[in-house]
């Protein structure tokens, strides 16, 4: 339905898909753990995600792209509240845990999680924690773009974010200009 709206088709020239995949692997991305909570039973869920970016400053909002086959995708369609936890360079083990190397039931045993006013767990030791309320969801191809209006945002001035590029973790550091 919305795929037609966006002109989605599978007519990409041969090889473009693989070349695009290789190209995107070389884009450094900030590593986040997105958390949400199922209704009623306080069943918490989280997943490592790198497809996150700001949308607008007025109103403050960001977008998250999630594969349609993930449980987090289904959860965000049902529950509007989620938190984007931007991990620090020291939180690789957390990223690994939430990327599927640890069962969903065990993931929150890593780290010192606290419950936000919206009922969702967040990580106070993260580089940043951005609480959002879903205001839109747009399917496209294998993924859905979720837009979240920011309800609170906190960032640490003493940590650096964890990055991921070419299937490995990277450190963020200021770049110097040569004279």
Curated annotation (Swiss-Prot):
Induction: Induced in the presence of gamma-resorcylate. It comes from the Bacteria. Keywords: FAD, Flavoprotein, NAD, Oxidoreductase. Its EC number is 1.5.1.37. SMART domains: Flavin_Reduct. Pfam families: Flavin_Reduct. One of its GO terms (molecular function) is riboflavin reductase (NADPH) activity. Coiled coil: none annotated. The keyword Lipoprotein does not apply. It is an enzyme of class 1 (oxidoreductase). Pathway: Aromatic compound metabolism. It catalyses: FADH2 + NAD(+) = FAD + NADH + 2 H(+). Belongs to the non-flavoprotein flavin reductase family. Involved in the gamma-resorcylate (2,6-dihydroxybenzoate) catabolism. Reductase component of the resorcinol hydroxylase, which catalyzes the FADPH-dependent conversion of resorcinol to hydroxyquinol. Catalyzes the reduction of FAD by NADH. The reduced flavin is then transferred to the oxygenase component GraA. The FADH(2)-dependent resorcinol hydroxylase is composed of two subunits, GraA (the oxygenase component) and GraD (the reductase component). Both subunits are required for activity. This is FADH(2)-dependent resorcinol hydroxylase, reductase component.
